[in-house]
């Protein structure tokens, strides 16, 4: 039987594409543009897994489709190659992280090329290349000049095992680090911060302008966390000190019975009484060991200590005890809250625990039993009594402003971005600190500030990066003799990925980040595909940098990525025992369609789970390509289900995709291909062209492949295949299975040219119309025959055709036909006696 020999065909076409630079980005100014971007990978030692090609295949299908439609297509690939794993590996083995990274990149590139993706490799970038990070550093100097990069002494999330501080976004809900799962503690350190908060409102508002999944927009909205309320100033009794509280409910001020400061609040030490000093100091020490997430966990027991001081409630002059508690964060709002225990669950639990006063100021509920958190008419609130929420807030804000103790305020949950890392393997921050107390950015002509090669890359332990050990690099002298030290912190891995999509547009430019005309031509990115796990971090940071570059006049668009799509996760096959515990695949015996634990004999339940080394269910694409071919892997991953669904890997599904490609190969290479069109496949072909075109546009790749299967089934029923339909079908197939597409195109055309730029087929609407219909013929209401007749045949003609049919002739022989009822396009009913 004829089959598709992937081992011969696929390498042949990969070599052809490379030798001919088939996918070089188009530059014809008269054509429309299409920029298809993948989230570039971190080149890990493990190499590519089968989850990577899912998103890559989707952008590749779109890129191949758009080239055939006459677009200039920019479809690049590169490497997000700084980061902790390479550094950790280097420390464990004594090897240079740059060598390790280069080896990993070579392996990734080999694997990617084996899958037939149409990348323009002339545009390959690597975030660890000094010619690339020169511009990462240049962007940092611009942030510094604009006052958007600054140094601050801040409590950081310190991970002793990693020897570095990490951003809030990198701390898991259980208070451990995202990388490594190590304990995170809070400690104050001098850090570089980026003022992303200056862009909070624009980052929020401009989400309306992009075509992104609503779930991702919501995650960003929640992270930015805009709330409108009021700042209220509270005086500390018997002192000249005061503090400010931000509240979204200034209308409940009459119910504020105590105040809580963050343990780190600047006022704490100066207002604490002698009697309470020891308890306060001990509480502060304990709080410093916890991460923000651990401190604000709603489920944890409320703890706190009274300072011994009182605040004065400005609205009624009542004394409010001032406490410190770790659930209030110095970095959020003003680091102080007014507690209204009658109407806030956390305040209520705290008040009950420490026997503090609870005064209801909204009608409804029983505050002895629980906090009442619904809306209600105001009570116990003097001039607000009888008002609803909106009216009461407005009236209280006016009162606060008239009496000078507060004002309306918009607040954001978003914090400034902690940008420095105490590691070696990252971009050096281009700042010099001089002994006269000033700091300056390294001038543009001296960039890149190259990361020095060193064997000693262990964290210094002092909170500085290993660069602090390299005195030759570290110490500099100005022309006027003033000595200085280079900044020893490096940038986080997020830096290089915050702007990489811009460098693809002009990757070899050594004069500027990218040429302005080229940026204008290619931006924004038309489709960006990657995992939803980057919803907040990477996507928010990239939008922030893009807006800064927009303000600097570097980029012409407000937003970088016009359309975003998150592919689902490919899950591995896994097995669970009766307790629900997962069992590694090498401990499972398959018998008669059931699964058993090899050691215990227990029958196991098959269940999809995330692929992991421990479960031994990670599928390596190299193995799939070797056994089934790259086109099979591509078609299978696109046919598994909707692109955004998470679906379990299945060997049977892979075999099904392979069988389909073999059927296609046989159809085109063994069927008689003819120059005359019999018309038999008109409807099937034009339906397929229309459906596949629409489904690729809508990224419904699974239904597009289903439609290709329908055409193959229809074509196999015919003796001959019209050459134009054979060619058109191969063109529709090519974005999904490009190696097979090229091979079959040559067998049909012998052109020696790639199929890549052949104009995409179009459908003819008139061919979609049915010219024939099937009607039933009944005798006394029972179906006796089915006929295919011309559509809209008249009653008289229909009657003639029905009565002339062999079966009907036999049925009515010797009988008298009383009546014939003919309904065009439906049926003929014959009444006999």
Curated annotation (Swiss-Prot):
Give the location of motif 'HIGH' region in residue numbers.
41-52
Residues annotated as binding ATP: 613
GO CC, one annotated term: cytosol
User: Its domain of life?
Assistant: Bacteria
Reaction it catalyzes: tRNA(Leu) + L-leucine + ATP = L-leucyl-tRNA(Leu) + AMP + diphosphate
Transmembrane regions:
none
EC assignment: the record states 6.1.1.4
Q: Name one GO molecular function term.
A: leucine-tRNA ligase activity
Q: What enzyme class is recorded for this protein?
A: ligase
Q: Where in the cell is it found?
A: Cytoplasm
Note whether Protein biosynthesis occurs among the keywords: yes
Coiled-coil ranges (or none): none
Q: Which GO terms describe its biological process?
A: leucyl-tRNA aminoacylation
Give the family from UniProt: Belongs to the class-I aminoacyl-tRNA synthetase family.
Q: What is this protein called?
A: Leucine--tRNA ligase
Q: What organism is the protein native to? A: Streptococcus equi subsp. zooepidemicus (strain H70)
């Amino acid at each position: 039987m004829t089959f598709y020999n992937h081992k011969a065909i696929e390498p042949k076409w990969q070599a052809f594409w490379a030798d001919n630079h088939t996918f070089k980005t188009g530059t014809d100014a008269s054509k429309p543009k299409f920029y298809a971007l993948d989230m570039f990978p971190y080149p890990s030692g493990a190499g590519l897994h089968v989850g990577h090609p899912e998103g890559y295949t989707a952008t590749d299908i779109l890129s191949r489709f758009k080239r055939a439609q006459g677009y200039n297509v920019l479809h690049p690939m590169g490497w997000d190659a700084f980061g902790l794993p390479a550094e950790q590996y280097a420390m464990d083995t004594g090897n240079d992280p740059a060598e390790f990274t280069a080896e990993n990149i070579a392996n990734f590139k080999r694997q990617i090329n084996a899958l037939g993706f149409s990348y323009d490799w002339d545009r390959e970038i690597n975030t660890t290349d000094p010619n690339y990070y020169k511009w990462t550093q240049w962007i940092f100097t611009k942030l510094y000049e604009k006052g958007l990069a600054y140094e601050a002494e801040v409590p950081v999330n310190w991970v002793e095992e990693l020897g570095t501080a990490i951003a809030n976004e990198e701390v898991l809900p259980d208070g451990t680090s995202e990388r490594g799962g190590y304990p995170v503690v809070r400690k104050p350190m001098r850090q570089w911060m980026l003022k992303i908060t200056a862009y909070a409102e624009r980052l929020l508002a401009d989400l309306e302008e992009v075509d992104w999944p609503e779930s991702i927009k919501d995650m960003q909205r929640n992270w930015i966390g805009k709330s409108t309320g009021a700042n209220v100033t509270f005086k500390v009794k018997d002192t000249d000190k005061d503090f400010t509280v931000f509240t979204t409910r200034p209308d409940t001020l009459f119910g504020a019975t105590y105040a809580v400061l963050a343990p780190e609040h600047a006022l704490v030490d100066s207002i604490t009484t002698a009697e309470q000093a020891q308890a306060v100091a001990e509480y502060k020490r304990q709080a410093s060991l916890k991460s923000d997430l651990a401190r604000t966990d709603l489920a944890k027991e409320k703890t706190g200590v009274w300072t011994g001081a009182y605040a004065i409630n400005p609205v009624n002059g009542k004394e409010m005890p001032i406490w410190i508690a770790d659930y209030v964060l110095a970095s959020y709002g003003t680091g102080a809250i007014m507690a209204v225990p009658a109407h806030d669950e956390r305040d209520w639990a705290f008040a009950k625990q420490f026997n503090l006063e609870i005064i209801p100021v909204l009608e409804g509920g029983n505050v002895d039993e629980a906090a009442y958190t619904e809306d209600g008419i105001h009570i116990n609130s003097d001039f607000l009594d009888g008002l609803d929420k909106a009216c009461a807030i407005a009236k209280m804000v006016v009162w606060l402003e008239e009496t000078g103790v507060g004002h309306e305020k918009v607040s954001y949950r978003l914090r400034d971005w902690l940008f420095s890392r105490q590691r070696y393997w990252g971009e050096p921050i281009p700042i010099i600190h001089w002994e006269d107390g000033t700091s300056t950015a390294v001038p543009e002509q001296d960039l890149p500030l190259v990361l020095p090669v060193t064997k000693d890359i262990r964290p210094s332990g002092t909170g500085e990066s290993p660069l602090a050990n390299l005195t030759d690099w570290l110490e500099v002298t100005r022309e006027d003799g003033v000595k200085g030290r280079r900044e020893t912190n490096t940038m986080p891995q997020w830096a290089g990925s915050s702007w990489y999509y811009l460098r693809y547009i002009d990757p070899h430019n050594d004069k500027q980040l990218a040429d302005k005309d080229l940026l204008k031509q290619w931006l924004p990115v038309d489709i960006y595909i990657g995992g939803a796990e980057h919803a907040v971090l990477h996507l928010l940071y990239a939008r922030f940098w893009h807006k800064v570059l927009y303000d600097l006049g570097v980029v012409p668009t407000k937003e970088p990525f016009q359309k975003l799509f998150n592919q689902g996760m490919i899950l591995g096959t896994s097995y669970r025992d009766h307790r629900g515990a997962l069992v590694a695949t090498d401990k499972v015996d398959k018998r008669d369609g059931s699964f058993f634990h090899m050691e215990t004999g227990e029958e196991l339940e098959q269940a999809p789970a995330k692929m992991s080394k421990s479960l031994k269910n990670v599928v390596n694409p190299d193995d799939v390509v070797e056994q089934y071919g790259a086109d099979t892997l591509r078609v299978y991953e696109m046919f598994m289900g909707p692109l955004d669904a998470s679906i379990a890997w299945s060997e049977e599904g892979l075999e099904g995709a392979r069988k389909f490609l073999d059927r296609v190969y046989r159809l085109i290479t063994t069927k008689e291909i003819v120059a005359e069109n019999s018309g038999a496949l008109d409807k099937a072909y034009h339906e397929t062209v229309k459906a596949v075109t629409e489904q690729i546009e809508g990224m419904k790749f699974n239904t597009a492949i289903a439609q290709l299967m329908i055409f193959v089934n229809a074509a196999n029923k015919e003796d001959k295949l019209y050459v134009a339909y054979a060619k058109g079908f191969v063109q529709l197939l090519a974005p999904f299975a490009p190696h097979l597409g090229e091979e079959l195109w040559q067998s049909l055309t012998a052109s020696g040219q790639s199929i890549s730029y052949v104009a995409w087929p179009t459908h003819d609407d008139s061919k979609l119309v049915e010219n024939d219909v099937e009607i039933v013929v009944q005798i006394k209401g029972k179906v006796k025959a089915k006929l295919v007749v011309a559509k809209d045949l008249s009653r008289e003609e229909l009657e003639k055709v029905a009565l002339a049919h062999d079966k009907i002739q036999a049925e009515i022989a010797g009988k008298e036909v009383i009546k014939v009822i003919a309904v065009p396009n439906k049926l003929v009913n014959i009444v006999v006696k």
